[in-house]
Amino acid sequence: MKTTCAYCGVGCGIRLSREGDNWQLQGDEQHPANGGALCVKGASLLESLAFPDRLLYPRWMGQRIGWEEALDTLAERFAAILAESGPGAIGIYLSGQLTTEDYYVANKLMKGYLGSANVDTNSRLCMSSAVVAHQRAFGEDLVPACYEDLELADLVVLTGANTAWTHPVLFRRLQQARARRPELKLVVLDPRRTMTAEQGDLHLALKPGSDVTLWNGLCRYLLDVDGWDKAYVAQHVSGFEALAAALDDPAWQLDEVARSCGLSRSDLLGFYQLFARTPKTVTLFCQGINQSNQGVDKANAIINAHLMCGRIGKPGAAPFSMTGQPNAMGGREVGGLATQLAAHMGFGEAECDRVQRFWQSPTMVRGPGHKAVELFEAVHRGEIRALWVLGTNPAVSLPDGNRVREALSRCELLVVSEVTANTDTARLAHLLLPAAAWGEKSGTVTNSERTISRQRAFLPLPGEARPDWWALTRLARRLGFGEGFAYEHEHEIFCEHAALSGFENDGSRQFDISGLAGLTRAEFEALSPLRWPVNADWPRGRDRLFEDGRFATPDGRARLLPLAQRFPEQPETPLLAGAVSLLLNSGRLRDQWHTMTRTGHVPRLQEAEPWPRVRMGAASLLALGVKEGDLVRLCNGLGEALLLVGLDEGLREGEAFLPMHWTDSQCSQGAVNRLIAPVVDPLSGQPMFKQGRVQARAQLTRWQGIWCGRGEWREPVDWWARRPLPEGNCTLLASWSESTESLWQRLGAEGHWLRLPMKEGWLAVALAGDRIEGILLVGARRPDIKVDLLASLLGTPLQAGALSQTLSQALAGESRLVCSCLRVSEQRIVDAITRQGVSELAGLQALLGCGSNCGTCLPEIDKLLIKHVFLASA
């Protein structure tokens, strides 16, 4: 059985085998994306299926109901709202976690039958700026490259992307290519010195938001040194004269660009020279480019440089937008954005007429609907009365999170299709619908290189969980649209989607998979990965687009665009006493996914970064008077967050980084998007998640503690953060309003506890009979403790000797996990170096296995080798 990973946009293939009742998972060696490799998230997919709060039945207002009642209620409410307020009062919010078939049915129902374009997706938050940039430059949303181009290039530029963490398998492919071909150079453009930047030949830590300046400067440099391809521009590109005139501005001269970007002249010149002399260049860009007040312009600035040099449509040469989710591309194909119609068609009269004739639908939208941020504003003001959210968690993932939660709580009818009831959004729903999870649902997904792959079901549907397309189809039938939604299998939906892509397509739309429209069900079930287009001209798919220099514009030419630098307005507010002003960046951790609905309950994925932690530079820590592990409060006019603080020497001073993953399920005050203003790109509507202005202050506490228990910590405290353990959970605790004695009085009144004094504070053991149910350590500062050792006591009989011995070992302190794949800690690596004499990477890999799988920990291992081998011998 073969399927596709549920996580990032690399789209790795997975092979499953069954031994008795147990499934085994490994990478698919034949899949073109990964060739058998998997990162730690992909390798732990089977573990993720054990959802602690799996939603198995529909619920209305918290009460279990059947599907018939749920769908009848939904249809009645939708029909009433449509009759009273019209189609604009209905909205659907989708996800890049859905299959293409789910997306297609939702889009068709909304735009062709209900007559509402208020259907958008969380891909708006990650890829919509790239979509608009492609449309402006190429005439259509087209990714011209494939992953092989990274291996064939002589220069790879990674910008706005910590690829080593966010797309580990693809980064590993790049690193392996560099090992085979040392002439392949890697340049990383990123304000942070990330794990990706650590491995580059050159890292340019440019000023946040200055990307247009840097790329305009490159284009100006190419003109100055005659480093552009005159013949290619003359034959295949329009807009050169306007761009050249705009680049004549002194702002784009080398010295001024270096100053504006905060870079040394020599580093910037080195990059420009390298780019100018390297024909085989791939520029890979991701959220650091897209999630901006001018993400579209940033992407077009990159594309400008490639078009000027003719570096597109050739092996090893292309601008390459990486998607964040497994099916963000599929959503774009079907028109799952409010600014698209369907199958890469817009809202022109001829296009609307074409799609309506194909669907034979009773109505058709004639213009775009509300983009994501606008959509939830429309909910807030009551314009959208009913909202159906499928497979995403907007209460956490959208900017201005407090206002979004307020909008959701005001919504007249909030429907949420989810695999678990325990998300911040699901807890606000009136109607909860149990969705099929990865491994239970079947369909197709498209990755960043346009590869369509099958996602196959290998598990039965639990309880009354159903695929999302099934629920949408049954609603459509109840609303009287049965003829248009007679689907009984995802194969029928896919074939219709494929047929629409080729309908009246004379070659003007390069998204065309009509060659798959006639698949039998058996052929669909056996479909192997292939890149679109798939049609009469390209029956086996196509690796690269634009080889012939023809683009999807009316004149067949790509477009160069003059671009201006626009920094976001960042109004400074008076500093609070003891506060430090910081520019807040947000992004991903290596081992987590989105809002942790799928990964947050998997213990081994928590080990490398178990707690919500904001990282900042040494000067900021000093100014705040805090040390690593202390609590820091972040605030601005939108909201607050309270987190542990950590040092990151790779950050520019005055800047901070906070992961996006934490929700109210894992931390009392950890959601970063409560601090992010709803500033969006005016063209794409994509929010600016990378540049929030906050103030940071030290949070003083009366006590801090840590709880390891078989059950969750239930007592109210001022602050908490929770992580799962194989048997139970671990929770950090802190209070500034209550004394430790008051806490003990509450505990002693409610259960069987044994309290023991410690050097600084006390330890309390919760008992069930003579067995340990939980252990609480409390003191002025939280102890640094080996959680796994403490957890080993859970469920065991209380024995003073065992408790004392284990506690003394646990208090020796936790060693940071370096290699998540093989679960190798920093201390084990250091011991191998200092005690066993291992002095090189190959020796560590042979002894411990660290760094031998996805490779994202290699920079950290290199640092440890430098510190404990080379510096020790110096």
Where are these regions (language model features)?
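Conserved short loop/turn motifs at secondary-structure junctions
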Residues: 91-99, 259-263, 286-293, 325-326, ...
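Glycine/threonine-rich phosphate-binding loop and adjacent beta-strand/alpha-helix elements that clamp
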Residues: 147, 439-461, 472-478
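Short beta-alpha connecting loops at secondary-structure transitions
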Residues: 198-206, 434-436, 440, 451-462, ...
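Extended redox/cofactor-interaction regions of prokaryotic respiratory oxidoreductases
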Residues: 104-175, 182-189, 196, 212-216, ...
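Flexible glycine/proline-enriched surface loops and loop-helix/loop-strand junctions
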Residues: 156, 199-200, 251-255, 284-289, ...
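Long, contiguous, secondary-structure-rich segments that constitute the structural scaffold
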Residues: 462-464, 468-527, 595, 599-615, ...
